[in-house]
Regions:
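Alpha-helical linker/hinge and terminal dimerization helices associated
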Residues: 30, 34, 72, 115, ...
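Short, hydrophobic-biased segments on the C-terminal half of alpha helices
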Residues: 65, 83-84
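Charged, amphipathic alpha-helical coiled-coil/dimerization segments
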Residues: 2-7, 84-142
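N-terminal helix-turn-helix DNA-binding core of bacterial DNA-binding proteins
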Residues: 32-75, 159-162
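Short, locally clustered residues in the helix-turn-helix/winged-helix DNA-binding domain
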Residues: 24, 28, 53-57, 120, ...
Length: 162
């Protein structure tokens, strides 16, 4: 009779563990690919691209820096460092609020808008080749619906509806 203890199974074994690990691995792999492609072709990180895109979506191509940080899921110090780099490149400018000196805005410049336009084709091609092209339309709709159930920051957030 063996006195050795049974070796526990290591790694994801339940459906929830398998799904969680698959999501983490897919996310990490996609971020590396998208970052690499944008850096190689346009000298932008994926976070740079997301900030330029978010600013371009605003009617005046401008947002309060604190709101921009929240919209791209960065900390206030993280958005400050990122914006400093984009400011040095001439893609973003800092603007003050005339009614509240504590408030500063990030403003997308024409040069930043052009850089975003150029990088968009690379990003869209990456999404199609590394992600969307691997699923049917129905699968993409299901995946989008499932992922939108997840909160973005905390229990009060509404996932994709926030």
């Amino acid at each position: 009779m063996s006195t050795q203890a049974k070796t526990p199974t290591i790694g994801p074994t339940t459906p929830e563990q398998v799904a969680w690990v698959a999501l983490l691995r897919a996310h990490a792999s996609a971020m590396r690919r998208f970052n690499g492609e944008l850096l190689s072709a346009h000298e932008l990180t994926l976070n740079d691209y997301e900030v330029l895109l978010r600013l371009a979506q605003e009617p005046e191509r401008m947002m309060r820096r604190v709101d921009l940080a929240k919209s791209v899921l960065l900390t206030p110090s993280g958005i400050t460092r990122l914006l400093e780099g984009l400011e040095r490149c001439g893609y973003v400018e800092r603007a003050s609020c005339s009614s509240d000196a504590r408030v500063t805005y990030a403003l997308l410049t024409d040069e930043g808008y052009e850089k975003l336009r150029q990088a968009s084709s690379t990003h869209v091609e990456g999404i199609r080749s590394h992600f969307a092209g691997r699923f049917s339309v129905e699968e993409l709709e299901t995946l989008g619906s499932l992922l939108c159930r997840l909160p973005l920051d905390g229990p009060e957030d509404e996932g994709c509806g926030a």
